[in-house]
Amino acid sequence: MADSVRFPCMPFPPCFLVCTRDDIYEDEHGRQWVAAKVETSSHSPYCSKIETCVTVHLWQMTTLFQEPSPDSLKTFNFLPRTWRLESRNTYRGADAMHWRLVNHSQFYGTEELVLMLDSR
C-alpha cells in the first residue's frame, strides 16, 4: 500500500491585526506581520474592474528589523491601524474600509496575506 503524502496544514488567517509600529502588525497569537509591499495599480491581477486597485502584502515574520525603514513611514501611513476579520474573506479596517483577502499562502516558510481595498 502506498504511503499517503501529507502537506503541512495552512493556519487560518488572523482574526485581527493591530499596528504596533509603522509597518508592523501583531495578530491575536502575538505573531508579527510586516507590510512588505503596497501596490497601487489600475491593472492588477486581483482587480477585475478598470479602476485604481490598492493591494497590500503582509508577511508573517519571526525576525524583525529594529528600526522601520524610512520609506515605510511615507508609503504605508494610509493603512488602517487595525484590521478585523469580518467574514471568511473580508477584513474591516479601523477606518471602516473593507479589504478583501485575495490570497493567504505560505512560500518557503513565509506566510503571506494579500489584502485588496474593496471599493463598494
Curated annotation (Swiss-Prot):
Which one of the record's GO molecular function terms can you name?
Answer: protein serine/threonine kinase activator activity
Q: Which InterPro entries does the entry link to?
A: TCL1_MTCP1, TCL1_MTCP1_sf
Q: Which gene encodes it?
A: Tcl1b4
**Cross-referenced SUPFAM superfamilies:** Oncogene products (SSF50904)
Report which superkingdom the organism of origin falls in.
Eukaryota
- What is the organism of origin for this protein? Mus musculus (Mouse)
The record's similarity note reads:
Belongs to the TCL1 family.
Pfam families per UniProt: TCL1_MTCP1 (PF01840)
Stated name of the protein: Protein TCL1B4
